[in-house]
Amino acid sequence: MKVAVIGAAGGIGQALALLLKNRLPAGSDLALYDIAPVTPGVAADLSHIPTPVTIKGYAGEDPTPALEGADVVLVSAGVARKPGMDRADLFNVNAGIVKALAEKIAVVCPKACVGIITNPVNTTVPIAAEVLKKAGVYDKRKLFGVTTLDVIRSETFVAALKDKDPGQVRVPVIGGHSGVTILPLLSQVEGVSFTDEEVAALTKRIQNAGTEVVEAKAGGGSATLSMGQAACRFGLALVKALQGESDVVEYAYVEGEGEYAPFFAQPIKLGKNGVEALLDIGKLSAYEQAALDGMLDTLKGDIQIGVEFVK
């Protein structure tokens, strides 16, 4: 099993690489790529960790050696948010980066499962899809926007509020991966109940958690360590499913049946070919239904921007 981390010298990439070096199954290959010259050094550093995972790092303009033979590609390349920026501001730089990488993936490892971490995910995933379509290699079962960070934040915040073990809390999060498009389904959390005020406050905190970290880092970066953890969780789920483990369920932003929007974050069952089944989002509360209805125009607009970018 080969996993490639693209953008591996960045804050997310290094955290993700560290976690994967420790947690990938024995015998896995981990390839790191970044345009930054430090990348082979990051791999050298991680290679000293005594786990049965081989690691190589590649730098420069061409990601081909890292992508060759990859089963899973996790893309975190791009610029990070700074105070005052929203995820849309990132679009101007990151859209071109994702487009160029998708063009490489289409040629070098078209059958790989690709997880897009680079923001704005609502838009970068449709960009990758359009590029892969143009190349004639698009398989909607194998392209994912990694929204796991919204899920782990929700689990953490709910556990703290209700004094639960965060490892035992499960919170479905649907929609997209920025602002109002992030919708935690708090009515479906088992074993706890919330007042209307708690629901409103928690939902807002989950939607704005990225900004919370950007501001706390005071210009020194965005959410890199928690995102590395989230991407690792999703990457390991993909690896398990590809290796034949059954009943692997995660949340991700994928091309669905178009019931809500062309791409939508929802629970998915993973299998040997990526998405095995789209799972139902379940029954929503009146608050959640109103929030879902209210965000769809924003989400569809984000998707359309990505489609237009590739045309």
Swiss-Prot record:
Domain of life: Bacteria
GO MF, any single term: L-malate dehydrogenase (NAD+) activity
Catalytic activity annotation: (S)-malate + NAD(+) = oxaloacetate + NADH + H(+)
UniProt effect for mutating P63T: In strain: M551
Gene3D superfamilies documented for this protein: Lactate dehydrogenase/glycoside hydrolase, family 4, C-terminal, NAD(P)-binding Rossmann-like Domain
EC number: 1.1.1.37
Binding residue positions for NAD(+): G7, A8, A9, G10, G11, I12, G13, D34, N94, I117, T118, N119, M227
Keywords assigned: NAD, Oxidoreductase, Tricarboxylic acid cycle
Effect on the protein upon substituting A277E: In strain: M550, M551, M554, M557, M558 and GD98200
Residues the entry annotates as binding substrate: R81, R87, N119, R153
Function summary: Catalyzes the reversible oxidation of malate to oxaloacetate.
Subunit structure of this chain's protein: Homodimer.
Similarity annotation: Belongs to the LDH/MDH superfamily. MDH type 1 family.
Record's protein name: Malate dehydrogenase
